[in-house]
Amino acid sequence: EGQYPLAAGTETIGTMMQKAGHKTALIGKWGLGGPNTAAEPNKMGFDYFYGFNCQMWAHSYYPDFLWENDKKVFIEGNEYMPVCARLDEGADPYDIRSYDKFNQKHYSCDLMYEKIEKFVDENADNPFMLVWTTTVPHSTVQAPEDEVMYYVNKLGEEKTPITDGGWYYPVLYPKSAYAAMITHLDAQVGKLVQKLKDMGLYENTVFIVT
């Protein structure tokens, strides 16, 4: 895990903001230094980290674990799914139930968003910087089934499911799933903005989107 590690002592936006007196967090994906190396997030300027520490494992939105600081946290209800897993032999690629094993209990975007709100709550009285490195809408295109079906009903059935996606999992409705992912992220950004307004922090917060 942790491809392309940064050199020890590299100056990052995290270290700069720490020096300026801010509490810092990175929530999402970090692929710049694996666990127990000199380039893991906590050693690169981030007081708190939660998310993926590997580009490849981030291909799944229903992982069986995520990292919280330097601890691997297993997600109860999500089972291990090998990278490059495929539909079961003989499964109907046009039957939505054939894809059940890829869509599990806990959607990683929601787990990360919970940590975002928690970090904001805990640091409301302090200067803080949050880096939200969302994995949306990277492949594998996955979203909660009800949100995908909203777009299937709106856009119609798709005739070309992805059954062999290389490093990514099979997807029955790739276009609808992609749209659902964007909508899901948009809703979470909206929730965060509203939360900051409710807390009286919005006017004193700078948003940088890249």
What annotation goes with each model-predicted range?
Residues 1-210:
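Formylglycine-dependent sulfatase
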